[in-house]
Design a protein with these regions (language model features):
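Beta1/beta-strand and adjacent pyrophosphate-binding region of the FAD-binding site
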Residues: 1-11, 29
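Dinucleotide-binding Rossmann-like beta1-alpha1 core, especially the glycine-rich loop
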Residues: 46-125
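Short hydrophobic core segments
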Residues: 6-8, 185, 192-204, 362
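Active-site substrate-recognition segment that forms the wall
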Residues: 19-20, 48-49, 80-82, 174, ...
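Helical element adjacent to the flavin cofactor pocket in flavoenzyme catalytic cores
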Residues: 138-195
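Glycine-rich FAD pyrophosphate-binding loop
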Residues: 22-42
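Short beta-strand to alpha-helix junction loop
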Residues: 60, 90-99, 139-157, 292-297, ...
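C-terminal lid/capping helical subdomain adjacent to the catalytic/cofactor pocket in oxidative enzymes
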Residues: 3, 16, 24, 334, ...
Length: 394
């Protein structure tokens, strides 16, 4: 039977879109070449960060998504381990403080309740931060966390209950084009026809897009991290270092840093799961599709983490992990129909924001596919046609 929509990709973005379409009456089949949550959605922390979003449309989309998370667990009928306990960003120099002051002013103007706090307050919220390495912090009470595994699977389960079909271990081997329009896909089990095909394959989206002659400007950006054994409460307030934000918004301040850590894009983030496992990292590396942990990466991440929070030395590490984030040139996802290939819809390029932006992305995609418009804030700025998709990749 012909489907209304084929969604390619079984991460949090693909599952959110499949659910959002199915609940509004579309017949949906989701195809995943491996297992659900097998890509970046299964290799990330649980942060729903708003402080990390650039002031403007990216932040507005993040706020929209965070508000949807507040009721999403009830809607899906699952415990997503959602908590809104805030995040702190740690600053290590006066230059970072000055840069963050400017970013904070712009974020507050858009309604985000973020503020600068002194070190005494930072240490009250999270003991163990190094006074020698950290000179100040910011705090935002809206920053939250959620279990990405449980959330992705809850989206998938809810979609199936509503009638969607999910096929794992089903790679797409080709796209079916008629008169320049996309009307289906080929798999090892045969062809599937549909009015719309959604590419939500994260870092692998360009591989599928190439089957339609597209050069989608998304690149894999590897992140490495550590996982500890479960311990009693160690992290009261999730942390991220401001260097990551400064690198996104003011890279010129870091242009003279020739260290290996800078080359690997090493930053600091730390969270603790509901079961007690501590996760910390991470790197941001352009290494193609090579997705393994490396001695250099792990060494630099650990050195940086211990410098900022010496108590990490007491943790027993049980494993390391790595994942490939889908990077886009302007740090914003590509969400919308492709002008030159009717029937093809992109929802990828979220990089490290897939978990944060999944609910809003699901709604935006469903709105645009069903009615050609959406009330999700600043949706037009994520239109994939801002890039020359049929020309040379950016």
């Amino acid at each position: 039977m012909k489907q209304d929509v084929i969604v390619i990709g079984g991460g949090i973005i693909g599952c959110a879109i499949a659910y959002s379409l199915q609940k509004r009456g579309k017949r949906v089949v989701l195809l995943e070449k491996n297992n659900l949550v097998g890509g970046a959605s299964g290799s990330c922390d649980q942060g729903i960060l708003l402080q990390s979003k650039a002031p403007g449309e990216h932040l507005l989309l993040g706020i929209c998504s965070m508000k949807m998370y507040e009721t999403l667990g009830r809607e899906l009928g699952a415990d997503l381990e959602f908590q809104q306990k805030g995040y702190m960003l740690l600053m290590e120099s006066q230059a970072e403080c000055d840069a963050m002051d400017g970013i904070i002013r712009q974020q507050r103007a858009l309604g985000l309740p973020v503020e600068r706090i002194e070190m005494d307050e930072a240490l009250r919220r999270q003991p163990g931060i190094s006074r020698e390495a950290v000179v100040g912090a910011t705090f935002c009470p809206w920053d939250s966390e959620v279990n990405p595994y449980k959330t992705t699977l809850a989206y998938a389960d809810a979609a199936v209950r509503l009638g969607a079909e999910i096929r794992i271990h089903t790679p797409v081997t080709g796209l079916i084009l008629q008169g320049g329009s996309l009307c289906g896909v080929r798999t090892p089990e045969g062809e599937i026809r549909a009015d719309t095909v959604v590419l939500a394959c994260g870092a692998w989206t360009p591989e599928i897009g190439a089957m339609a002659g597209l050069n989608i400007p998304i690149r894999p950006r590897k992140g490495q991290a550590y996982i500890s054994e479960a311990v009693s409460p160690f992290i009261r307030c999730n942390l991220l270092n401001a260097r990551y934000i400064v690198a996104k918004h003011h890279p010129e301040l870091l242009s003279d840093d020739r260290s290996l850590a800078a080359k690997l894009g090493v930053g600091f983030c730390i969270t603790q799961s509901a079961k007690g496992n501590v996760m910390f990292g991470a790197s941001r590396e352009f290494a193609g599709y090579e997705n393994t942990n490396t001695p250099d990466g792990l060494r630099e991440i650990l050195s940086n983490a211990v410098r900022l929070m010496p108590g990490i030395r007491s943790l027993n590490i049980i494993r390391t992990m790595s994942g490939l984030r889908p990077y886009s040139p302007d740090s914003k996802p590509l969400i919308g129909f492709v002008r030159d290939v009717p029937g093809l819809f992109l929802a990828a390029g979220h990089e490290g924001d897939g978990v944060s932006l999944a609910p809003a992305t699901g709604k935006m995609a469903a709105d645009l596919i069903l009615q050609g418009k959406t009330d999700v804030p600043a949706a037009a700025s994520f239109n994939p046609n801002r890039f020359p998709l049929t020309g040379k990749a950016a």
